[in-house]
UniProtKB/Swiss-Prot annotation:
Compositionally biased region (Basic and acidic residues): 99-109, 120-129
Residue span of region Disordered: 56-132, 151-184
Record-given protein name: Fusaric acid cluster transcription factor FUB12
Organism annotation: Gibberella moniliformis (strain M3125 / FGSC 7600)
GO CC aspect terms: nucleus
Keywords on record: DNA-binding, Metal-binding, Nucleus, Transcription, Transcription regulation, Zinc
Known DNA-binding region: 17-48
UniProt note: phenotype after gene disruption: Substantially reduces production of fusaric acid.
Induction of synthesis: Expression is positively regulated by the secondary metabolism regulator LAE1.
Known role: Transcription factor that is involved in the formation of the two Fusaric acid derivatives, dehydrofusaric acid and fusarinolic acid, serving as a detoxification mechanism.
Length: 661
């Protein structure tokens, strides 16, 4: 039945409505008026609006008052605010084309329209850092300082000026005068086909968010939990941040949740969410600066099941760049509601900066010259109303807070040690002095975390902190006993050897404990990568001709136990990526019996003839010509294995044995 004409009662229309433009379908709004026939047939007449034209003004570029902007109805991003006009058009033109009718889902998917990118939180309205990034050019910085000084003087001489107009700031006006380039229709179509603007169904996304705050956030609390949940529930959360959260949390959700999101395994899910976040970032679909910083930090703690140029090093450098540009270090000095969040963010970056350098001294310290800030305390966490968010947030425990504080202290200890061993004239006495606080630090953890007898009451935070400390002690002592820093002191090498073996023993004990308690799947990526580093150290000891037969035999036994631990988490992307290389090395050196099920895991690494059968306990000895590891990773399979500096070669960090903190 033809629709009655409404053209007589509406203004003349000469273009398609926003939903039809987004879907690239024919629109009859010019004939029948609004809503058009397509929107009526899809039962979404409220979404049928025209995109706003940018009006020309005679004087100034911000003729619109804040009051008039507030009166503009929220039509899924079709009517752009001045702040939104500087954002990529793909975000602002996306309509909610989801077939779901759940109001919660409509709210969540409203973030596709660009409302998620408005930087209008109370914490970022009234100041440039961290709410607004600093200007990139010197003359703009000088002008900005001049404007700020003049504004401050005028404010002191008159009534306090309201901060409800962030668009009137000098920095915002610069963005209006020099808007970033807009994406064209081809880019929009490409991103839409990649489903960058889509999220899992709300009931599954809720599980993902909860898993993130239960298993990821406690070890890197870089979000304000209640602010995030409010923006997520209202549909105004940055998509880049949501995809990053989903990528990190995909390791901890149940298999049913993965299936509900359309993924068969964790590797596929994590790679998909990671790719969407990466595309969102690469196409400059910018969210607010804080969300982009937080998302980059989350992606910096993710290891995929395949090598990527955008690895943890890339995202860490990107995080430091964004934090410096936002002036987060200055925000840590203020005394307001946002100070706690920015102090935690800055300390997490500070810890990672030291650990990155400690892992490989070829890395440069990015924050070495940053001004010192006051150490974290338990008061640096927000007070939360848990009754309102009890379904998705768990209370923050004493152990969680102490965990991050302890990590900061640990980073300081190892930072002091590295400053000595990398100096021009390191001495054994000075190294002993700098490492001494480590033992007292470990002893104090149980009491500080208020640990109970039950494993669930904070024990995972205790074990994760201990694991990190023993891991980096192993790295340091290994390098000392191998003469990495040209230390000729024989007594120092013997001391390093003893501490190295003790740390290895403690790591073995911790790994066995989490296996017995069946909690290895609940521990963070930093713990998982420690297991791969531990296995590499055991392999090195087992094949080291300089070691005694007892040490080599014990190392072989430890290889078996560590492989059992990895087998429990072999569906984790980081482990799926590392296992094939480990299995080839172990098989070649007859350190680990491989069964038929094991050989299936390395089918992409070697070719097994069809007439060759393997029974349990049989050692697979593939010919070298069948190995197809990347060229950079093949050198350790041949020749003198001990001559290869297994944990130091930079190309081996493709496997991330020790490459993530």
């Amino acid at each position: 039945m033809p629709l009655p004409s409404r053209a007589s009662s509406t203004p003349k229309i000469s273009k398609a409505c926003v939903p039809c433009r987004t879907r690239k379908i024919k629109c009859n709004a010019a004939v029948v008026g609004l809503p058009c026939g397509s929107c009526v047939s899809r039962e979404c007449p409220d979404e049928c609006v025209l995109s706003a034209r940018k009006r020309r003004t005679v004087k100034g570029r911000n003729a619109e008052t804040p009051r008039s902007r507030k009166n503009i109805p929220d039509t899924n991003g079709s009517v752009l605010s001045p702040r939104q006009q500087q954002l990529p058009t793909n975000v602002s033109r996306q309509a909610t084309d989801s077939s779901h009718s759940d109001p919660v889902e409509e709210s969540i998917h409203a973030s596709h329209t660009g409302s998620s990118l408005r930087n209008d939180t109370p914490h970022s309205r009234d100041r440039r850092p961290p709410g607004q990034t600093q200007a990139d050019l010197l003359y703009l910085n000088i002008l900005q300082d001049t404007v700020n000084d003049t504004s401050a003087a005028q404010t002191d001489a008159s009534d306090h000026q309201s901060n409800d107009e962030p668009d009137d700031s000098f920095n915002s006006q610069i963005h209006h005068w020099n808007p970033p380039p807009q994406l064209d229709d081809v880019d929009n179509e490409y991103l839409a086909k990649k489903k960058v603007f889509e999220l899992p169904p709300p009931r599954f996304m809720e599980n993902i968010v909860k898993a993130y705050f239960d298993y990821v956030h406690p070890f890197a609390p870089i979000l304000n939990r209640t602010d995030f949940i409010q923006s997520y529930r209202s549909g105004s959360c940055c998509l880049f941040l949501l995809h990053a959260v989903a990528a990190a949390a995909s390791l901890y959700v149940t298999h049913d949740v993965l299936i509900g999101c359309g993924y068969q395994d964790r590797s596929t899910a994590q790679a998909s969410f990671f790719s969407k976040a990466k595309l969102f970032h690469d196409f400059h679909c910018q969210g607010d600066p804080l969300s982009m910083l937080q998302g980059s930090m989350i992606l910096g703690a993710i290891i995929l099941d395949h090598p990527s140029d955008r690895d943890f090093q890339y995202w860490f450098h990107n995080s430091v760049r964004r934090a410096s540009k936002m002036g987060v270090q200055n925000a840590c000095l203020r005394d307001d509601g946002s100070q706690k969040l920015y102090r935690r963010i800055w300390w997490v970056l500070h810890n990672r900066d030291i650990f990155h350098f400690f892992i490989n001294t070829q890395n440069m310290r990015l924050l070495a010259n940053a001004p010192p800030i006051r150490p974290l305390t338990e008061a640096d966490w927000e007070t939360e109303d848990m009754e309102q968010w009890s379904g998705i947030l768990s209370p923050i425990s004493q152990a969680q807070k102490v965990s991050l504080i302890a990590q900061c202290e640990l980073a300081q200890i190892f930072g002091n040690v590295m400053s000595v061993v990398t100096s021009s004239t390191p001495s054994a006495e000075e190294i002993h002095k700098r490492i001494l606080p480590l033992d007292a630090w470990r002893t104090s953890l149980p009491e500080r975390m208020q640990l109970m007898a039950s494993f669930a009451n904070g024990e995972k935070y205790h074990l994760e902190a201990l694991t990190t400390s023993y891991r980096f002690e192993c790295i340091m002592c290994r390098l000392l006993r191998r003469g990495r820093w040209q230390m000729s002191d024989g007594g120092l090498r013997e001391w390093a050897q003893q501490r190295f073996r003790s740390a290895i023993f403690e790591l073995d004990t911790i790994v066995k404990r989490v296996m017995i308690n069946n909690t290895i799947q609940k521990l963070p990526t930093t713990f998982i990568t420690t297991i791969t580093a531990l296995l590499a150290l055991h392999i090195e000891s087992a094949l080291d001709a300089a070691e005694s037969s007892l040490i080599r035999s014990m190392a072989r036994i430890s290889v078996q136990h560590t492989m059992l631990a990895l087998d429990q988490i072999r569906d984790t992307p980081a482990i799926k990526r590392a296992l094939p290389a480990f299995e080839i090395v172990l098989s070649k050196n007859k350190l680990y019996p491989m069964s038929t099920s094991d050989t299936e895991q390395i089918s992409t690494i070697q070719t097994i003839p069809q007439d060759q059968t393997l029974s349990d306990g049989q050692i697979l000895q593939p010919p070298p010509t069948d190995m197809t590891l990347p060229q950079d990773d093949q050198s350790f399979l041949y020749g003198d294995f001990i001559g290869f500096d297994f944990l130091d070669r930079w190309q081996m960090e493709q496997l991330d044995f020790t490459g993530i903190y």
